Amino acid sequence: MPTTQKTLMFLSGFLTSLGSVVVICSILGTQAWITSKIFFTDTISNGTIAITYGLFRGTSSQDLNEGLQELDKNFEVLGILSNSSQKSLHVVVIILLILSLAASLLSSMFTFYNSISNPYQTFLGPMGVYTWNGLSASFVFLTMVLFVGNVDSNHLSEKLSQTLYPDAINKKTTHTYGYSFWLILLVILLNIVTVVIIIFYQKARYHQKQEQRKPVEYAPRDGILF
C-alpha cells in the first residue's frame, strides 16, 4: 500500500488532471472562442457583421447604417465551410483538442492509480504522468496557435461571413478572443501544476531514502558487524 504522503500528493495530481479534463470539455462545448466584427459594403448599404463562434457552432448578426437588415443567424462552422484550407485547419484544431482531452484523461487515471498502488518503476508511475501531461499541454498549445493562425492569416471569419452574407464586400475585420479560447491557458497551467506536484513527491521520497541510509552509513563498524 502507498504511504499517506504519496496518496495525498497523487490525489492532488488526480484533481488537477481531472480539472483539465473538465476545462477542455468546456472549451469544446462552448462557442465563445472569438467574436469578429467585419465592416462591409454592399450594393445598397454598408455596416458591420458580428460573428461569434466556437469549434462547432456560431451566431451572426448584421447592423446596417441604412436599409433592412437580415435576422440573426445560427450556423454550424464545419457545415458552412466548403472544402478549403480554413476547414482543413479547423478540423486539425478540433483533433488536437480531442487528443489533449484524451491525454488529460490518461493522466487522471495514472495519478489515481498511483494514489492506491505502487507501480513506481514502470510507465504507470510518475514517468507516465509526466508523459501524458506533457502531451496534453503540447496538443492544447498547438490548438491555440493553429486557431489564431487560421483566423488571422487564413481569414476564417471572413470566409464564414462570405458564406453567410454573399453580397457583402468585406472592408476591415477586428477580432476579440473570448473566454473559451483563453481557457486553453488554464489547461496548460493545470498540466504544469500536476507535474510540479509529482516532482515534489519524488524529491520528498528521495530525501526520505537518504535519511534512512544515514544511520547505516554512519554507524560504527563494530555495531554493523554484531
UniProtKB/Swiss-Prot annotation:
InterPro entries: Clarin. One of its GO terms (cellular component) is membrane. One of its GO terms (biological process) is sensory perception of sound. Glycans are attached at residues 46, 83. The chain crosses the membrane at residues 8-28, 92-112, 128-148, 181-201. Keywords: Glycoprotein, Membrane, Transmembrane, Transmembrane helix. Its main location: membrane. It is a multi-pass membrane protein. Belongs to the clarin family. This is Clarin-3. It comes from Rattus norvegicus (Rat).
